[in-house]
């Protein structure tokens, strides 16, 4: 198997997800120490894709050349580069983080979550419960253009007005102008920002402009806000205290993550790259859980890319211990919309930052399939 992610880069704007390959290697140590997958050794090759399209394609070509059975639990924003190479080699892509739109359209991709689209659709539903008006601050880009319709579907379902759309550059060092617009147009309601790594910068600007004693509810989605970010920016004193956040999985303190935490404690050997609160690490754990189910279903035959694909397409069920709904990728399990044909998991979770921790705002999962199928293509 192969797992890739951006690990080391001299580009200060590049994302770094060193915990992803580290989690994959930790999972393999655990599996192999406990008898393998029905006696088979799990071998993991890691690749640093450097957060570049060239690096992503290089990793994909290496996966094909080394005849790996699957690429599992990886992170890359460059699906337009890696997916064609995997398709040419017939190698499946299992449980990618969801940072590339191609992960939700390629016939060889088997996503374990609904990507940012599901988060936005769910976030509209979450905000619709308590926000009379919403300002959405999002990237001034083609990808950003698809955000308002998804968010608005959830708001409109709660009989709330559509959000106010505020565009922001992704290379800014300050967002005072956008923060002022968001504050003015929120009407005392809610301000949500989905700016990836720049979300922190926006809310720094926003909190400085807020009138004393008048705290507007802020919100975002996982990927733009995370527990490691909250910890790094002050915990309970961070600008995210009180924020609504929509995620894919149960909050990090949920007991369903205990097995993963135990494995990290025993087999990561103190590797500080692995943060069990990090959604990228959690997604890699779930992806390898899916791989394990597929390999077990193959039985005594050789594990090849073709057999992994046939097993997944044939309807093998993946029980993630309640971290997601049961996952299957038969044709009838797919959402099948034009924009997101490969999504099978349309469930999200509603969380809120309390005392510096992401905690469940509402128990269980919320299904946003209807909001995804109603959204226009972005």
Label each region the model flagged:
Residues 68-168, 214-241:
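Extracytoplasmic ligand/sensor domains, especially the bilobed periplasmic-binding protein
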